[in-house]
Amino acid sequence: MVTNKRKKLVIAPSLLAADFSDLKSEINYCNDSDCTWLHLDIMDQQFVPNLSFGPDVVKDIRKHSDLFFDVHLMVSNPFDMLDSFIDAGANGISFHIEATESRFTFPPKILINKIKRANLLCGIAIKPKTGFKIIEKYMEFIDYVVVMSVEPGFAGQKFIPESIDKIKEIRSFIDEKNLTDQVSIQCDGGIKLHNAKDVINAGANVLVAGSEVFQSEDPIDTINKMNQL
């Protein structure tokens, strides 16, 4: 088992799995629970096949919650969206290395600097088939890594078991480079009460849970149980 020396566990319910016909109530479940983060998936139907919501929705949600807004940009051009989501009330923004590294229209370091200059936490996300090595050179500049444990785009998918080894690899790198107090590992996708402990033991300390929370009979109880693992 990898020793997780990072700060305490963070549960980040993913609003993508919520009932959008009663969004205020769904957000209040999170407000009334022990969670401190709310995960907001932003999709443009280009980088991923789904389309979610934009900065105006985030701005409206901000009026009803003081939680840490963790904005996950699953978009083909994250740089052009940064200002809108910063202004909408994001507290942290993650972008996909696959949308930046390969083409260098806006190199990752430019996005990192812009996010950090706005006094937000900055994360880099990697898809299941993307190796960790591609983001090693950016680790000292960011606050968290998002390990996608499902293919990004849709809620309710099954957890990809190989994600455990990737988390362990990243945790070892973080500890060896003395970045333990700086960089968190977020695991996003297929997180359930029955597998969350394995993810934590592998070294993750931020768990994004969508369907497990919002499709449960008691979302508040589900969040609180996960938070106590």
Residue ranges and their predicted role:
Residues V2-S94, A99-P107, K114, C122, ...:
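Conserved N-terminal beta1-alpha1 strand-loop-helix module at the mouth
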Residues H39, Q186-C187:
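Generic enzyme active-site microenvironment
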Residues A90, G203-N205:
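Conserved acetyl-CoA-binding loop of GNAT-fold acetyltransferases
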Residues A125-K129:
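Short gly/ser/thr-rich secondary-structure transition/capping motifs
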Residues C187-G190, V208-S211:
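Glycine-rich beta-strand-to-loop/alpha-helix junction loops that act as flexible
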Residues G190-A202:
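Acidic, divalent-metal-coordinating active-site segment for phosphoryl/phosphodiester hydrolysis
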